[in-house]
Amino acid sequence: MDVSMTSTLFKPYTMGDLELSNRVAMAPMTRCRADQAHVPTDIMATYYGTRASAGLLITEGTAPDANGAGYARIPGIWSDAQVEAWKPVTKAVNDAGGKIAIQLMHTGRVSHQLNMPEGATVIAPSAVALPGK
């Protein structure tokens, strides 16, 4: 890689009020490390905190509602417990000098009822389920 390219990559970047320490972004990766109630865990704070040298971290897909939590152990933000559990994650990233943003993910027809919280319903624009398991 050209030296001028790498020197630009690692320079701070500002867009509006957002100031990043560099121009590196970590793309979201669904890791399924939340607990059974879709509450973020300590291991998630450690994972994201150790990657905070990227200018911007984008979290794994996070369900905004129980009806969108179609994968087991993906984090959510629909309960007070989930919102509170995200605070140590964001603190770990911010304390290490990084910035973090959430990727909202509603699984729609990819959902499987067995992976959803009790009482949740598959909601999607189509009643046709995806083929396969």
Locate the predicted segments by residue.
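Non-globular sequence segments
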Residues: M105-K133
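Active-site mouth loops of central-metabolism enzymes
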Residues: M29-I43, Y71-D80, R109-Q113
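An N-cap/entry alpha-helix motif that binds or orients negatively charged groups
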Residues: M1-G16, V24, P28-T46
